[in-house]
Amino acid sequence: DAAEPQVAVPLGDFFGTGPGVNPFRTLLQEVDARKAGDGAEMVSRWEMPYRRNARIAVANQSGSPVDMVVRYQWRDDPAAADMLTFHARWLQRDDVQTVKGAGTLDWPALRVSGGAGRFVGLQCSLYNPVTAWWGEGDEKVYVDGEPFPSTFGTGTEDYFGYAWGDPAPFASPFHAQTRCDGPGTKGNTSLLRLQTLDAIPF
């Protein structure tokens, strides 16, 4: 009965594979290009509690016909009335400029207001037009208006599960780099981090 969709994300980004079909497997997400002929099987194992009803809608904005099969599992759970609901949002920026040695640039990836919740993951796809490494920025999480971040990381590459600019795809239960074009870290890169064990409450 929500007035707006609680999940509003392009399909490839929701499944952690965008841009393109990039096979990988983590604890909660999987893309398998071998099972579906010319397409791909995309799997999400996120639990998505709802109280009265749920609706899944997929919009094809490509201009080309797409065949799709959707399978889901559900169960009655009396505890669902007390559970937090699942939300996912998508943000695109194509105007992020480098500071060319003039300091740092903080780029907000998510702002949340209105209600309690848990931050449980992030998927990041980017295009790097140069071979220079893009990921030295530290992730910072400010909770409930705090003046200094309660989470202050050591670098984007550390947040996504590797300690230097790895140019090869990889996947583990909670981290993945599903695409890295190269040479080096030039071109499209797609990363994801699941924070189910270290969720951030707000």
Each predicted region: which residue ranges?
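Beta-strand-centric surfaces of beta-sandwich/beta-rich domains
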Residues: D1-F202
